[in-house]
Amino acid sequence: MSLGIDIHVKESVLCIRLTGELDHHTAETLRKQVSGHLEQTDIRHIVMNLADLSFMDSSGLGVVLGRYKEIKQLGGEMIVCAISPAVKRLFDMSGLFKIIRLEQSEQRALETLGVAS
């Protein structure tokens, strides 16, 4: 299975919706797309909606961590939302939730960042 990437900007937030599998075959594509948006637009925060992401491996975790570091350097925050149980377990085991906030929905994540829907 491949990775579907839907990226849109809402005020100063880069909203990323992923579907399918984020693994070593697809991680570089996501990295390039997100980094390109961060370079070209006035983005302060990232919301990553993982509701339809069925699989993630360590390469996917690396991409998430790398984008977290990028947005932190810009003074922003990353929020992961609507995460599936399997992917949530991977985040839990990796310790990423110690630095990246988890919200139940994209709507709630945007509200947390002060962006109206």
From Swiss-Prot:
Keyword field: Phosphoprotein, Sporulation
InterPro entries: Anti-sigma_ant, Anti-sigma_F_ant, STAS_dom, STAS_dom_sf
An annotated Gene Ontology molecular function: antisigma factor binding
Residue span, STAS domain: 3-113
Record-listed Phosphoserine modification sites: S58
Any one GO biological process: sporulation resulting in formation of a cellular spore
Modifications after synthesis and translation: Phosphorylated by SpoIIAB on a serine residue.
Membrane-spanning parts: none
Gene3D superfamilies: STAS domain
Presence of the UniProt keyword Ubl conjugation in the record: no
Family of this protein: Belongs to the anti-sigma-factor antagonist family.
PANTHER family named among the record's database cross-references: ANTI-SIGMA FACTOR ANTAGONIST TM_1081-RELATED (PTHR33495:SF2), ANTI-SIGMA FACTOR ANTAGONIST TM_1081-RELATED-RELATED (PTHR33495)
Free-text function comment from the UniProt entry: In the phosphorylated form it could act as an anti-anti-sigma factor that counteracts SpoIIAB and thus releases sigma f from inhibition.
Protein name: Anti-sigma F factor antagonist
